[in-house]
UniProtKB/Swiss-Prot annotation:
This is MICOS complex subunit MIC60. Keywords: Coiled coil, Membrane, Mitochondrion, Mitochondrion inner membrane, Transit peptide, Transmembrane, Transmembrane helix. Signal peptide: none annotated. Residues 63-528 are mitochondrial intermembrane. It is a single-pass membrane protein. GO terms for biological process: cristae formation. It is found in: Mitochondrion inner membrane.
Length: 528
């Protein structure tokens, strides 16, 4: 069809240029108009459109059906990953932007051709046609008819004819997205001058194809919008369910965290409450002592105020006795101060005596009681004697703290325990007293045998220096609770008996020193 247009245009131009013919050319017999030829562009456009729709529909179905998706993955058609990604994650705005970009590209295509290009293309077609006709005539022996070149050499009659143009396409009933394409076709039609019987049919066919294209675009857009709405609705439901599930999970996590934090806060609050209760008890006990002191001080102040008011009330009538009242008031003030000092001293003394009594009771405790450390009670004693500021008491505390700081109520032996250990130690002392100097195994054996033959002495011999007299005096002193004399007798031993009694002497001295130092503090406190 396009070749016919160019041939007709070329023939018209030829008629305008060539001179008038001398001999009229021999015209070929009339030929019947050919039937409507096959349109390759229309076929390609339809096939491309149908193939694209089928390909896109197959990939869209693959997103919904696993079997189709397996088929697509097995055969791997071209660009299937990109199209699937666009179907799953694309949006209407992206499709519209792509369509607008494609439409702009089509509208920017330059379909207009210059007249020189058309003439050149027509000359090429004419030359190829002449060559084809010559070859055909040579083959079939038909050389009688003049060739187109011969016809051109003959003068022809010159006629003036204005070029006709094809009718333009109409925009009526066409989708707006195809307007740019229609405009491009109209520009192409304007650039072509043609006169022939099939021009109107050609324009009508193009108009029908454009209308069908517009209808298909509308149908495709409507189906795409419907499918998009369905997908959006399904996605909305899925998102709503997922958000609801996440909300429930977050609520459970928050409740669990809340319960955990609540339990921890309750635990901390209970511990803090117990600590505050203990502090409050201690503060209340201290406040009770302070309250007694404050009441006495307040009574003294009230008495002073009463006296002052009495003096001020009777000053005008009894000025002669004012000096006596002033001296009496000074005496009362001194008495109040001395009374306050005595009260404080009595309180400190009672606190010190209580601490000393607790230490004595712990030192004298029996084995059946629970062992207790003496360090806290020593701390209470130090705090109690600190306000006194006495040098003797401070020196005594420096001696007693290293002695009893690491001891407990069971580590310091009582008098009965010392007596029991002395009785257990007595046989060994008797045996050791019979050992000669540098005794060997035989000496130890004989001393053990002869020690069994010794008869224990009943009663104490004040002047006896033998081992039996010493053992008897120690036992008698322990029975009379005279620990200092017992330690002195045990320390007077010599040789192996003194070595054997060394541990007993250390334990006895520890108790003796503790009792002596506590008694010294108690006596000093009483003398204050």
């Amino acid at each position: 069809m396009l070749r016919a247009r160019f041939s007709t245009s070329r023939s018209v131009l030829t008629k305008v240029v060539t001179p008038p013919p001398v001999v009229p050319p021999v015209l070929p017999p009339p030929v019947k108009p050919p039937k409507k030829s096959f349109s390759l562009p229309k076929f390609l456009f339809s096939a491309t459109l149908i193939g694209s729709l089928a390909y896109g529909g197959t990939l869209y179905v693959a997103t919904k059906n696993e079997k189709v998706m397996d088929y697509v993955i097995d055969y791997q058609p071209p660009f299937y990953e990109e199209i699937l990604r666009m179907i799953e994650t694309g949006s209407i705005d992206e499709i519209r932007d792509a369509w607008d970009s494609l439409r702009d590209r089509i509208s920017n295509v330059d379909f207009s051709s210059s007249k020189s290009k058309i003439d050149k293309f027509a000359n090429d077609l004419e030359n190829r046609g002449e060559q084809l006709i010559q070859k055909t005539r040579q083959r079939w022996g038909q050389d009688t008819a003049p060739t187109p070149h011969e016809q051109l050499q003959k003068p022809v009659e010159t006629t003036q004819k204005s070029p006709e143009s094809l009718p333009l396409l109409s925009y009526k009933g066409i989708n707006e997205s195809v307007h740019a394409t229609v405009a491009s076709f109209n520009e192409l039609i304007k650039s072509i001058d043609i006169s022939g019987p099939g021009s109107n049919d050609l324009v009508k066919a193009i108009q029908d194809n454009v209308a069908k294209l517009s209808q298909k675009v509308d149908a495709l857009t409507a189906s795409f919008d419907d499918e998009l709405k369905k997908n959006l609705k399904v996605s909305q439901n899925e998102l709503l369910s997922s958000y609801t599930k996440k909300e429930l999970e977050l609520t459970e996590n928050l409740l669990h965290q809340y319960n955990t934090e609540r339990a921890q806060l309750e635990k901390k609050l209970n511990a803090r409450l117990e600590q505050e209760i203990a502090s409050a008890k201690e503060a209340i006990s201290q406040a009770a002592v302070n309250a007694v002191t404050m009441v006495r001080i307040e009574q003294t102040k009230n008495f002073e105020k009463l006296v002052k008011d009495k003096v001020d009330g009777e000053r005008s009538g009894r000025l002669a006795n004012l000096d006596k009242l002033s001296s009496r008031l000074d005496e009362l003030e001194q008495f109040a101060e001395s009374l306050e000092q005595q009260i404080v001293a009595n309180h400190n003394r009672s606190t010190i005596n209580r601490s000393l009594a607790e230490l004595r009771s712990l030192i004298s405790s029996t084995e059946g009681t629970t062992p207790k450390s003496l360090a806290p009670y020593l701390g209470q004693l130090i705090e109690a004697v600190r306000p006194i500021n006495d040098e003797l008491i401070d020196a005594t505390l420096k001696e007693i703290v290293p002695l009893l700081q690491h001891e407990s109520s069971h580590s310091i032996l009582s008098t009965s325990q010392l007596l029991a250990r002395w009785e257990l130690l007595s046989p060994e002392l008797r045996s050791a007293s019979l050992l000669p100097p540098n005794a060997g195994l035989l000496g130890h054996f004989t001393s053990f045998v002869f020690s069994k033959l010794l008869l224990p002495v009943k009663g104490a011999k004040p002047n006896g220096k033998d081992i039996e007299s010493v053992i008897g005096r120690v036992e008698a002193n322990l029975v009379r609770n005279e620990l200092d004399l017992a330690v002195e007798e045990a320390a007077s031993l010599k040789g192996w008996p003194r070595k054997l009694a060394d541990d007993w002497v250390v334990e006895a001295r520890k108790r003796l020193e503790a009792e002596f130092l506590l008694g010294l503090i108690e006596g000093e406190v009483r003398s204050l």
